[in-house]
Amino acid sequence: MTIESVMSLFYDAMKVTLMISLPLLLSALCCGLIVSIFQAATQINEQTLSFIPKIAAVLVSIVIFGPWMLVILSDYTHTLFYNLSYITYS
């Protein structure tokens, strides 16, 4: 394996990881921001109030984006196994 092939594998793995995790992280971020603004406006300082909506938002985003994330991950895995002989013997 050459340096270029290792870097290409690492780049593709990081790209797939970011593509899969980004919808979940963005939904948790937006939900946390909205709940924090609500808590600041109403002066409610309850820790569980910010935790429960984040879990719900992540679960909803898994339901919405789950099939897309599964297609991305299975395509990457298929490509990785298809090119396995090239990766190990070059």
Swiss-Prot record:
Pfam families: Bac_export_3. The keyword Lyase does not apply. It is a multi-pass membrane protein. One of its GO terms (cellular component) is plasma membrane. It is found in: Cell membrane; Bacterial flagellum basal body. Keywords: Bacterial flagellum, Cell membrane, Membrane, Transmembrane, Transmembrane helix. It comes from the Bacteria. Role in flagellar biosynthesis. This is Flagellar biosynthetic protein FliQ. It comes from Buchnera aphidicola subsp. Baizongia pistaciae (strain Bp). The gene is fliQ.
